[in-house]
Amino acid sequence: MVSFDRPVWAEIDLSAFRHNMRQIKSLLQPGTIFCPIIKADGYGHGAVPLAHEAVAMGAGYLGVAILDEAAALRAAGITLPILILGYTPPQAAAFVVSNHITQTIFSKEQADALSAAASNLGITVKVHVKVDTGMTRIGVRPEEAAAFCSYVAGLENVHLEGMFTHFASSDSADHAYCLEQFGRFTAAIAAVEASGIRLGIRHCANSAAILSLPEGHLDMVRAGIILYGLKPSDECPMPIDLRPVMRLKARLAMVKQVPPGVGVSYGSIYHTQKESSLATIPIGYADGYTRMLSRKAQVLLRGQRAPVVGRICMDQCMVDVSHVPQAAVGDEVLLFGGPDLPADEIAAHLGTINYEVVCMVGKRVPRVYVE
């Protein structure tokens, strides 16, 4: 199959990624395991290239959400321990075991399936028990943790390596609920260890907690959004310097002069008010530049902002460049990324978070890795 370079790309700055990793590690005590979270294709940045960078930078674990993500890393030659943070059906246990993947568990059915598969293969499988301290998602209740861990520890060919929880509001200025969750988790740890079980890796700190709850770092931290240079929230303190890793870019496909009163794009919801210069950008909602940004977003062209006019199409959108007379076909356009047009601005237009903005960038947008 012949593939041609699109005049649309997501520029991924590897030096920024490494810088962010160094900055985050500066907050940790010696011996704390650093676990980059590269689920959802590395938050849209490309899991495999960034996994290789993370390994080279001294990561001790990698975190993903689903089995397919772990499998892709193994297929790419990543040998570092990988923790699947989410649910994996018991029928996939043999694949988990044979690929030396660490699985999150919270039910006897999962644990039994992993034990059976590991016994059949003559391999010991590592597991981490998830404790639901207040996210109300997957996980055993804190008061169930000791009994469940005792059950798991008694299974053949299963190594109970760790236990963890996830904070629901560590990115909030009010840490009351986060501290309540942390208290429940530490109580669960104490109950488990009082039963004679030694938990090698206890972890609960996500990006926001890494920044604002040092007592929650424990044995391992899970760095997600901050690894990509984005803030967990506006309320979250930022004691380190982060650099955005992704910039979404394109090149102008056409520039045309349009008289007053002309409708633009589907539905003609926008009409030119005067003689205008309009440019077409070959990116649309199929690429993750969502239709919901129509008449809201701006792009950066030749150092100036240009508003999106009319509805964003599946593959193209239009901007008014009347105030940029030098605009020409082939000019580079920044759709988001960096300090001048941050992903947070796009998120604000959409009523969402920066996580979703970078994750929305579609598969047909090439990722171009730069230093």
UniProtKB/Swiss-Prot annotation:
GO terms for cellular component: cytosol. GO terms for molecular function: alanine racemase activity; pyridoxal phosphate binding. The modification N6-(pyridoxal phosphate)lysine is found at residue 39. Its EC number is 5.1.1.1. It catalyses: L-alanine = D-alanine. The active site is at 39 (proton acceptor), 266 (proton acceptor). One of its GO terms (biological process) is D-alanine biosynthetic process. Pathway: Amino-acid biosynthesis; D-alanine biosynthesis; D-alanine from L-alanine: step 1/1. Its cofactor is pyridoxal 5'-phosphate. Keywords: Isomerase, Pyridoxal phosphate. Belongs to the alanine racemase family. Catalyzes the interconversion of L-alanine and D-alanine. May also act on other amino acids. This is Alanine racemase. The lineage of its organism: Bacteria, Pseudomonadati, Thermodesulfobacteriota, Desulfovibrionia, Desulfovibrionales.
